[in-house]
Amino acid sequence: MFRLSNYMLRKSQFPQGLVRAPFGIRGYAQAVQKNEKLVLSMALPYQTIYEKVPVTQVDIPAEDGEMGILKDHVPMIQCLKPGVISVTDESSNKSKYFISGGFAVQQPSNELSITVPEAYKLEDFSSSVANQLLEKHKAEMNSSDEGVAAEAAVRVSVLESLVRALK
């Protein structure tokens, strides 16, 4: 793949018939049609939480660190780690969701798309139950069964993020 991209960079245009042009390709001189506000779409495999809703800000737990996304944010794709997504609507009301991971894509048109396997309102969690589960799975990490220990390590990682978010 890299050889193809390097070849394309050296050539002034694509060789005839080598690559079919993708949909929506644009040149540097063409402007992108932008929304006036940040527009959020957030979906799970079984439910859409937001569908093209104008918002003020979205805070995400990216693998590279916590990020606040506002209107006119640079286009990017981020892998999300377990943590809290905070959505600030136009009335400055905040909604917080705990996610187990996922992806966020910021388009040049001010559209932010978030896809996650699981998302739950933060207020639906019990801090005491989360702490109890964390202690239980920390103990399971010392299991002699590698499978049990590996599953416990994943659960501990997610539960530690949840316990931090609930404080």
Swiss-Prot record:
Subunit structure: F-type ATPases have 2 components, CF(1) - the catalytic core - and CF(0) - the membrane proton channel. CF(1) has five subunits: alpha(3), beta(3), gamma(1), delta(1), epsilon(1). CF(0) has three main subunits: a, b and c.
Purpose: Mitochondrial membrane ATP synthase (F(1)F(0) ATP synthase or Complex V) produces ATP from ADP in the presence of a proton gradient across the membrane which is generated by electron transport complexes of the respiratory chain. F-type ATPases consist of two structural domains, F(1) - containing the extramembraneous catalytic core, and F(0) - containing the membrane proton channel, linked together by a central stalk and a peripheral stalk. During catalysis, ATP turnover in the catalytic domain of F(1) is coupled via a rotary mechanism of the central stalk subunits to proton translocation.
Swiss-Prot/TrEMBL keywords: ATP synthesis, CF(1), Hydrogen ion transport, Ion transport, Membrane, Mitochondrion, Mitochondrion inner membrane, Transit peptide, Transport
GO terms under biological process: proton motive force-driven ATP synthesis; proton motive force-driven mitochondrial ATP synthesis
One Gene Ontology MF term: proton-transporting ATP synthase activity, rotational mechanism
GO cellular component, one term: mitochondrion
Pfam families: ATP-synt_DE_N, ATPD_C_fung
Subcellular location: Mitochondrion; Mitochondrion inner membrane
The protein's name in its UniProt record: ATP synthase subunit delta, mitochondrial
Range annotated as the organelle transit peptide: 1-28
Gene3D superfamilies reported for this sequence: 6.10.140.880, F0F1 ATP synthase delta/epsilon subunit, N-terminal
KW Aminoacyl-tRNA synthetase (keyword) present: no
Family as reported in the entry's similarity comment: Belongs to the ATPase epsilon chain family.
CDD domains: F1-ATPase_delta
Main location: mitochondrion
InterPro entries, A to Z: ATP_synth_F1_dsu/esu, ATP_synth_F1_dsu/esu_N, ATPD_C_fung, ATPsynth_dsu/esu_N
